[in-house]
Regions:
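Phosphate-binding glycine-rich loops of NTP-binding sites
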Residues: 9-11
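Active-site periphery "cap/insert" segments of enzyme catalytic domains
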Residues: 2-6, 15, 19, 23-187, ...
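Extracellular/surface-exposed low-complexity repeats and stalk/linker segments enriched in Gly/Pro
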Residues: 349-383
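Short, conserved active-site loop motifs that form the nucleotide-linked donor/cofactor pocket
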Residues: 142, 180-182, 312-314, 318-321, ...
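Acidic, metal/cofactor-coordinating or nucleic-acid-engaging core segments within structured domains
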Residues: 40, 193-240, 289-300
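Short, surface-exposed amphipathic charged segments that create phosphate/polyanion-binding patches used
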Residues: 183, 194-205, 331-344
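C-terminal regions of proteins
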Residues: 258-266, 273-348
Length: 383
C-alpha cells in the first residue's frame, strides 16, 4: 500500500528555519538599493506593498499589470534576481540545521511516520485503521511529494536506519514498511527551482496572458514540462497509486491549484481513499461546539473552490477528509546556530576583557552580583 505525504514550507519552519517569504523580503529590499534601476524598482515595489506580497506567487499575477509587451522581460529579470537571492537565503538557512544526532532524529521521524494518524479524532482514526487492515498483507511505502526547494526533508528521512518504518508479521509472512520515494515537484535549490503561477488565468495583465512566449516563463506546470525533469509526472503517478494522502505544512494556495484539483479527483476515485490535512493551530479551542465544524467547512469550501472536476462535489467526500491541528513533524534542529551564537558571545566577552582594566570583573547573569565592586561590568541575561 502507498501512503503519500505532500510536504510544504511548514516542515522547514518546524525544523527552525526562517523560510517564509515575509522573513526574506526585508533583506531583499535592503539589498536592492544598490542594484540597477529595473531590479531596484522591484525591491521598492515590495517595500511599498509588503503586506500584499505575503503570498508572493499569487501577487506576481497582479504585478504583471505594471508591464506591457515592450518591457515584459523586465519582469522576468526581476523574478530571476529575486529567485537567485531567495535560493541563496534558503541554502544559508538550511546550513544552520544540525543533523549530528542521527539516532534521535531517525527515531523521531520513524515513530512519527508510523503513528501519523494518531492525532485525528477517534472516528477518523478508526477509518484509517480500516484501510491498514484491508491492506495488511502487503508492504507499506511512505512516499513524499515536497513543494520545498530545500533538502531538509530528505536529510531527516535519511536518518531512519535502512529507511525502515516497521516490520509486521501476517499469516507467517513478514512485511516491511519503508520510506519510499521523495519527489521535489518544484525542483531544488540547485536543480531548477520553480516560482510562478498555476495557470494563465492568474496573469491579470490580459495582453501578457495572451503572449505564449511570455507565459511559459511564469506558469509552473509549463516550466515543469520545459525542464523535462519528470517531477510533476512522477508526483502525479505517486498520487494515483496512493490509498492515503496527507497534506502537511501547506497553505492550500491557489498557485498550486493543479494539485488540489487532482486530489479531489483522486479522492473521488475510490471509497478506500482518504485525505488527511494537517493544519497547525496552537490557538484552537475545543471549548466551543462551532470551531471544529467551521474549520472543516472552510477546508471543504476551499477544496470545492479549486475543484474543476465535472460532477464531483467535495461535500460528498467529507467523510473521507480528515483534519488534524497538530504539528506532528516539528523537530527544531538549529543547535548549530545556537552554538555559533554562544561562541560569538564568548569571543566578544574576551575582546571586552582585553579592553578594560585587568582589575575589572565582567559578570554575566540574570541578577546583578552582590559582590560586584564599583567599575565592574554586569551583562544582564534576559530570556
Amino acid at each position: 500500500m502507498e501512503i503519500t505525504f505532500l510536504i510544504g514550507n511548514g516542515f522547514d519552519i518546524g525544523l527552525g528555519m526562517r523560510t517564509q517569504y515575509s522573513q526574506f523580503i526585508p533583506r531583499y529590499i535592503k539589498n536592492g538599493k544598490n542594484k540597477s534601476t529595473v531590479l531596484k524598482d522591484f525591491s521598492e515595489q515590495l517595500g511599498k506593498n509588503i503586506d500584499k506580497w505575503s503570498y508572493f506567487e499569487k501577487q506576481i499575477g497582479e504585478y504583471t499589470l505594471e508591464f506591457s509587451k515592450d518591457n515584459k522581460y523586465d519582469l522576468i529579470d526581476q523574478l530571476e534576481d529575486f529567485e537567485k537571492e531567495f535560493i541563496a537565503y534558503l541554502l544559508e538557512e538550511e546550513s544552520k540545521l544540525e543533523f549530528n544526532d542521527s539516532d534521535k532524529i531517525g527515531q523521531f521521524f520513524q515513530e512519527t511516520i508510523l503513528k501519523f494518524y494518531e492525532t485525528l479524532h477517534p472516528e477518523s482514526i478508526t477509518s484509517i485503521k480500516e484501510v491498514f487492515k484491508t491492506y495488511r498483507a502487503s508492504g507499506h511505502n511512505y512516499n513524499f511529494i515536497s513543494f520545498n526547494y530545500t533538502q531538509a526533508l530528505d536529510k531527516c528521512l535519511e536518518k531512519i536506519p535502512n529507511k525502515k518504518i516497521n516490520t509486521r508479521k501476517v499469516s507467517n509472512t513478514i512485511y516491511t514498511d519503508t520510506v519510499g520515494k521523495v519527489v521535489h515537484v518544484h525542483g531544488l535549490c540547485n536543480q531548477f527551482p520553480l516560482i510562478g503561477l498555476n495557470d494563465v488565468e492568474q496573469i491579470k495583465n490580459s495582453e501578457l496572458a495572451n503572449n505564449p512566449e511570455f507565459v511559459k516563463y511564469l506558469i509552473k506546470p509549463s516550466l515543469n514540462k520545459l525542464h523535462r525533469m519528470g517531477n510533476a509526472s512522477n508526483a502525479s503517478k505517486m498520487i494515483d497509486t496512493s490509498k492515503i494522502i496527507c497534506i502537511y505544512g501547506m497553505s492550500l494556495g491557489e498557485t498550486d491549484l493543479l494539485w488540489w484539483n487532482k486530489l479531489v479527483a483522486w479522492l473521488n476515485g475510490g471509497n478506500d481513499r482518504h485525505l488527511i490535512v494537517f493544519e497547525h493551530d496552537d490557538h484552537f479551542s475545543r471549548s466551543s461546539q462551532f470551531g471544529w465544524i467551521r474549520k472543516m467547512d472552510s477546508l471543504i469550501d476551499k477544496l470545492q473552490s479549486y475543484n474543476k472536476n465535472p460532477g464531483i462535489k467535495v461535500e460528498s467526500l467529507r467523510d473521507r477528509i480528515h483534519l488534524s491541528l497538530k504539528d506532528i513533524f516539528a523537530y527544531p534542529l538549529l543547535e548549530k546556530e545556537r552554538n555559533n551564537q554562544i561562541e560569538s558571545f564568548e569571543h566578544k566577552i574576551e575582546k571586552l576583557q582585553d579592553k578594560v582594566d585587568k582589575t575589572t570583573q565582567i559578570y554575566i547573569g540574570k541578577e546583578e552580583p552582590s559582590n560586584a565592586k564599583e567599575g565592574d561590568i554586569w551583562l544582564q541575561v534576559v530570556e
